[in-house]
Amino acid sequence: MNLRVLYEDNHLISVFKPSRMLVQDDVTGDASLYDQVKYYLKNKYHKPGNVFLGLLHRLDRPVCGTILFARTSKAAARLSEQFRNHSIKKIYHTFVFGHPAKKADTLVHFLTKDHELNITSAQLEDVEGSLRAELSYEVVETFANTSLLKITLKTGRPHQIRSQLSAIGHPIMGDMKYGAPDLLPDQNGIALMATELTFKHPTKEEKITVTADLPANWFEYARNS
């Protein structure tokens, strides 16, 4: 097991989720990050019996980056409240096709999901059954045919970043489900990473920021696309 621990104390643990890995078990029976973290804690601290681990949020399976778990029920309750009231700052970076017309902008869409196809549509009108989605982006760097964007997520809807960027004509590299022309050269997920989480520590009056670096090969793919 090759688990990348980004931050750990007695109350919480943050780890790096690789592309293609599930955060939580599903019907596929594939290995999940949740189970890996429980195994890591059980063995590191020689804990008998079941290990408590609070699942606080998720990332889409093709997405990689920072994931936060609670190690106590008190921490789980307090951190879950921060996720519910949107006080946790979530930063993503992504490589997209094309060059956005604006160097920075806020996008608001209403999302509807086709559960059979597992795809989300983003539209400007509020239709019945849709969920409001908001994000802000900044263009960090441009290449010949692609751009690197920094995304600040205001809401946390499934497939939100993927569908909203596709809706404005800039699909994420490797994300063929949302309009990318092909997979990444390594065929490993999509070029979207949760790079930063900032939250209030559940027992101390301090802010914690957990970060992860973008892989160098994504820059190479962006330059060559």
Q: Which stretches of residues belong to each language-model region?
A:
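RNA pseudouridine synthases
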Residues: 1-225
